[in-house]
Amino acid sequence: MLMTAEQYIESLRKLNTRVYMFGEKIENWVDHPMIRPSINCVAMTYELAQDPQYADLMTTKSNLIGKTINRFANLHQSTDDLRKKVKMQRLLGQKTASCFQRCVGMDAFNAVFSTTYEIDQKYGTNYHKNFTEYLKYIQENDLIVDGAMTDPKGDRGLAPSAQKDPDLFLRIVEKREDGIVVRGAKAHQTGSINSHEHIIMPTIAMTEADKDYAVSFACPSDADGLFMIYGRQSCDTRKMEEGADIDLGNKQFGGQEALVVFDNVFIPNDRIFLCQEYDFAGMMVERFAGYHRQSYGGCKVGVGDVVIGAAALAADYNGAQKASHVKDKLIEMTHLNETLYCCGIACSAEGYPTAAGNYQIDLLLANVCKQNITRFPYEIVRLAEDIAGGLMVTMPSEADFKSETVVGRDGETIGDFCNKFFAAAPTCTTEERMRVLRFLENICLGASAVGYRTESMHGAGSPQAQRIMIARQGNINAKKELAKAIAGIK
């Protein structure tokens, strides 16, 4: 049964998740002002699934349990499923202007499903059955799963087994008859605290020397020995200021990252999906990366829609909307944003079935998509800053605009002067101008810049990772033969 947004939030309260921030344990993390906006983002994935207007995008019928499920728990059954995934992600980006945190889990489901099938084919293991039963449980209960791939990595020039500290990549430290014990951490984990469960994957291709690091499994967020340390974001403590509203830029929604620590966590056999089969670590990584690079052609585009709208509003409020250079910049922003969407849709339309039966995206086009994502959002926010003007970063606080402290010769307050000197076109109030500029500050430089700027660079793999895959998938030799044929070279 599909949960409501309210039921999702209440379900988090029932977990015994250990969360630490600023060196202290956070007892009521669900209502903590720095965390709650990210929970609201996830809740939106539940809210829209309940809305008939969005049912076709947000929900689908499960091929495993035969019931209606949230699309975030779906195994893609067609290229239409892949396209709807991207459209759903764009919609949620438009509704939250933030990272809504469920994409990694969805992409992990599809990568692990197909990879475990092929592991079982080679080694006669039961990983595919383990995973299928696990996903049925997730679908039946409409749960959030954090997909966790990135290890801390330590010295990037060394393999996992060659690190000075062996825990810098998550690893198996003990094998038992009933399961395994793991130790290490997963870094930069988007939405991990807001998740009911975690599904762990290796972060790189591995050799036999690294076999203890070749592990994939699932565990609950409140597993014994698991805890999370909340990651900071630019301007994050603004959320803790009394009565904070306008200065936040995006009061209701936000992203979240954390370091997830596994301090000797036991994993039972039925929740293990890869255990020392090192030759399949690379396949799992590559498939997950492909799905996640496709995802960015949806979510970042939706956020981009809001950024473009905010820039256009700022131009209106500044009285500059008719300037030809402003119009041209908005056209360029739209061109860049829609190019990203084209990439997301293209790699979906060119998808194909895996041996396990679910659909995989076109890997080359997915990597082209993410390569563009590493660049275009930066240009979009640069143009937004250009249109907005310097007040975006020099504006006094909301408290100053509301201040009744008398400072003027004729009894004027601080608020009177702020509202007087920061008024703009008659089509808007000073507060409306403040609000749109604070939003742009937040998305360009503040807490939301984590999800729209730096995540666009490094999320789903840093730029060079895509270039390696583009080189691998680009089939240059075939292109040489085409050129030879046209040029008459034998």
UniProtKB/Swiss-Prot annotation:
User: Which GO terms fall under molecular function for this chain's record?
Assistant: 4 iron, 4 sulfur cluster binding; 4-hydroxybutanoyl-CoA dehydratase activity; metal ion binding; oxidoreductase activity, acting on the CH-CH group of donors; vinylacetyl-CoA delta-isomerase activity
Give residues annotated as binding FAD.
149-156, 188-190, 325, 386-390
EC number of this enzyme: 4.2.1.120, 5.3.3.3
InterPro entries attached to this UniProt entry: Acyl-CoA_Oxase/DH_mid-dom_sf, AcylCo_DH-like_C, AcylCoA_DH/oxidase_NM_dom_sf, HpaB/PvcC/4-BUDH, HpaB/PvcC/4-BUDH_C, HpaB/PvcC/4-BUDH_N
Paste the cofactor note.
Binds 1 FAD per subunit. Binds 1 [4Fe-4S] cluster per subunit.
Q: Which reaction does it catalyse?
A: 4-hydroxybutanoyl-CoA = (2E)-butenoyl-CoA + H2O; vinylacetyl-CoA = (2E)-butenoyl-CoA
- Reported cofactor(s): FAD; [4Fe-4S] cluster
Q: How does it assemble?
A: Homotetramer.
- What is this protein for, i.e. what is its function? Catalyzes the reversible conversion of 4-hydroxybutyryl-CoA to crotonyl-CoA. The mechanism of the reaction seems to go through three steps: (1) the FAD-dependent oxidation of 4-hydroxybutyryl-CoA to 4-hydroxycrotonyl-CoA; (2) the hydroxyl group is substituted by a hydride derived from the now reduced FAD in an SN2' reaction leading to vinylacetyl-CoA; (3) isomerization to yield crotonyl-CoA.
Kindly provide the name given to this protein in its UniProt entry.
4-hydroxybutyryl-CoA dehydratase/vinylacetyl-CoA-Delta-isomerase
